[in-house]
Amino acid sequence: MQRESMEYDVVIVGAGPAGLATAIKLKQLAAEKDQEVSVCILEKGSEVGAHILSGAVMDPVAMDELIPDWKDKESPLTTPVSRDEMYFFTTEKKAIKWPNLFMPKPMHNKGNYIVSLGNVCRWLGEQAEALEVEIFPGFAASEVLFHDDGSIKGVATGDMGRAEDGSEKESFESGIELHAKYTVFSEGCRGHLGKQLIEKFELDKDSDPQHYAIGLKELWDIPEELHEQGLVVHGAGWPLSESASTGGCFLYHAENNQVSVGLIVDLNYSNPHLSPYDEFQRFKHHPKIAKYLAGGKRVSYGARAIVKGGLNSLPKMSVPGGLLIGCNAGTLNFAKIKGCLLYTSPSPRDQRGSRMPSSA
């Protein structure tokens, strides 16, 4: 079946921080050289930010580089970190507070902001559209298209209106092909097209195996007297230590008397009976956490896969006609345990030679 096609200079798959920042930077560079470049972003969510789930504490260095006047544009970076606390949870009742004096410098969050990464993406989407980037929410890229020479031609969206047996219903609409000179894949952790490209082009043959975790997060409304806007709490140990498993936890005091609380469980745990969800529920009952949640109300929750292998697990990120970025590739500032601040940071080429091309 012949499908309709659209032509662009660059097609970006995924409207997360990496994809949106790439689109904005491309438009900025084109404007500096008085050139026109057509950029399209495909986003599977119903809107930009719909599939974003993160704590998050964000270093504004990337935003300073991408949009230097972000403070004048009603950005969602409005809650600066006021202080840090770090704990090692020893038992279900006890915890040892790590003195800030001995905390590694990358773990200090002075100058960072507590944000909703979904709101950050929505705001970045507005900045991208102001630069005439075309964003198509509600359309998932279902396959990669190739030229005869094996280079990437673009992507195609999935068909709509097929029955369970694959037959076409009356409402059937075929997918659309989006052709580009360059296609950027920023689908997030374990994106299905990115996995296909890594396998097809053997991008990870010189890399260490990638590591993954699952992150569970809840957003709570808490009483005003328990809220300390800007407080960042990190920790490790119990309850995962009981099963010799590893991971970490966090609690961030955002604005409007809300806190984000979460547990991250490394997916190399050996206990087949371990339930990350149940461990999260236990964690919330620890006195160091429960004291903030008492009398509060959970307003949203979610979970997502996290890539955490770091520099040695990065695959090669460029292929003929395409590029892997963000969590699709596994970029991570391992020292800070952060990924979202990398999307416009200086070229990681300095860190790993030719394995990583310059970031957009």
Question: What residues fall within each predicted segment?
Answer:
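Conserved small/polar residues in nucleotide/adenosyl-binding loops
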Residues: 343-350
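FAD/FMN-dependent oxidoreductases across multiple families
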Residues: 245, 271-272, 276-341
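N-terminal Rossmann-like FAD-binding beta1-loop-alpha1 element of flavoenzymes
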Residues: 10-35
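A short, basic/flexible loop-to-alpha-helix module at the beginning of a structural domain
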Residues: 1-6, 168, 172
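Short beta-strand to alpha-helix junction loop
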Residues: 107-126, 271-274
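N-terminal FAD cofactor-binding segment of flavoenzymes
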Residues: 45-91
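Glycine-rich FAD pyrophosphate-binding loop
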Residues: 29-50
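Predominantly flavin-linked oxidoreductase catalytic cores and closely associated redox partners
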Residues: 131-286
